[in-house]
From Swiss-Prot:
Protein source organism: Serratia proteamaculans (strain 568)
Subunit annotation: Monomer.
Positions annotated to bind Mg(2+) 1: 10, 48, 70
Cofactor binding note: Binds 1 Mg(2+) ion per subunit. May bind a second metal ion at a regulatory site, or after substrate binding.
Job description of the protein: Endonuclease that specifically degrades the RNA of RNA-DNA hybrids.
The protein's Enzyme Commission number: 3.1.26.4
Protein's recorded name: Ribonuclease H
Gene responsible for this protein: rnhA
Keywords (A to Z) from UniProt: Cytoplasm, Endonuclease, Hydrolase, Magnesium, Metal-binding, Nuclease
Any GO BP annotation: DNA replication, removal of RNA primer
Cofactors demanded by this protein: Mg(2+)
GO cellular component, one term: cytoplasm
């Protein structure tokens, strides 16, 4: 039987684009681990994705994961849009390159060994873990230490 793990995530951006951060909580039974990091120039969507990626990549064995995010972009992207993007060679319906393809590919890889149930939670609505992740993400965004090397400003 697979370990049952809960992951809660949030991303933040002070300006969009601008300094950003992510926060994630990984919970297995009574044990919790938190993750956060800040980036000098990024977007809110990239930080939402990074939160999920980092937490999923921290899992060392296949797990049954319930991942809660307040990002419809992440949830819809990974459960619905990604299938056609892959069929089209990472292009959108109007033949444009998929934005944040580096992170979509990384997220796609990160979920392969797990059974993931994606849950959407309303942000800033008193969901305790989402609020904690929001604080982690905002604190990280306020003190960015890394460059988001995959971020490509739109020209």
């Amino acid at each position: 039987m697979l370990k049952q793990v809960e992951i809660f995530t949030d991303g933040s951006c002070l300006g969009n684009p601008g300094p950003g951060g992510y926060g994630a909580i990984l919970r297995y039974k009574q044990t919790e681990k938190t993750f956060s990091a800040g980036f000098r120039l990024t977007t809110n969507n990239r930080m939402e994705m990074m939160a999920a990626i980092v937490a999923l990549e921290a899992l060392t064995t296949p797990c049954e994961v319930t991942l809660s995010t307040d990002s419809q972009y992440v949830r819809q992207g990974i459960t619905t849009w990604i299938h056609n993007w892959k069929k089209r060679g990472w292009k959108t319906a109007d033949k444009k390159p998929v934005k944040n393809v580096d992170l979509w590919q990384r997220l796609d890889l990160a979920i392969q060994r797990h059974t993931v149930k994606w849950e959407w939670v309303k942000g800033h609505a008193g969901h305790p873990e989402n609020e904690r992740c929001d604080v982690l993400a905002r604190d990280a965004a306020s003190n960015p230490t890394q460059d988001d090397v995959g971020y490509k400003p739109e020209s």
